[in-house]
Amino acid sequence: KLANHLAGSLYDMLPADPKTVNPAGEWNTIVIRVKDGKVTHTQNGKKVVEYTLWSKEWDDMVANSKFKDFQGFQEGISHEGYIGLQDHGYPIWFRNIKIRELK
């Protein structure tokens, strides 16, 4: 398994560090905060990934990922829209999903 494909990571771009994922059978708590383009992933209370959307860093990560040819990534991530929840064919459960606007 690739490190940037595991829980808490920015999929195929940045691995979660430190690795704070709980073992199978235990719930993980993930918070993804986006404010003015700055994104932070927190997993089980620890910051594991940080990056800035709409930046050269972001464009470079996309160019070196599997998303380089995906519509919407090279043109730039939109400032509002949809979210996606992802799995890879294994059993998965979600609970207490909350989305709120930061003011």
Please report, for each region that a protein language model flagged, where it lies by residue.
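Carbohydrate-interacting regions of secretory-pathway proteins
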Residues: 1-103
